[in-house]
Amino acid sequence: MRLITSFLLALLITSCTHKMSPTVVIYQGDLRVSFNSIGSGINHSAFDKFKAYLDDYNAKADPKVAYQITSTGREGEKDVCVQANGNRNFAGLVQHINDLLKGEKWVNIQEHQDCGKK
């Protein structure tokens, strides 16, 4: 009987410990994805896949992400700036974008950027 009482008392004491809530990290800066060219135009399949992903994300997510496409060259080069705007899910979005575009030729991903400056 003492053993059971001791066990229940120990269980009660250990279950009363304060549990830490997970810390939410706010992503700092924006994400810039550059589609470059070396004389034959950009990787259109990667650009189309990326743009479709952003549009699909915005169709399902709340809050949505703002992005801006800027032409940067004569061969169709583009910079896409995806703005964090304090979105708590932005770090996960950045990881998905990195996975989506991993191994794509002539695509450069820059994290923690200021899209107002280059």
Predicted feature descriptions by range:
Residues 1-5:
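Positively charged n-region of N-terminal signal peptides that target proteins for export
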Residues 12-15:
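C-terminal motif of bacterial Sec signal peptides marking the signal peptidase cleavage site
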Residues 17-19:
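Bacterial signal peptide processing site
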Residues 22-39:
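Short glycine-/aliphatic-rich beta-strand segments at the starts of folded cytosolic domains
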Residues 39-40, 83-91:
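Helix N-cap motif at beta-to-alpha junctions
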Residues 44-65, 97:
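Short amphipathic alpha-helix segments
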Residues 69-84:
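Surface-exposed aromatic
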Residues 91-118:
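C-terminal partner/receptor-binding element of secreted or periplasmic proteins
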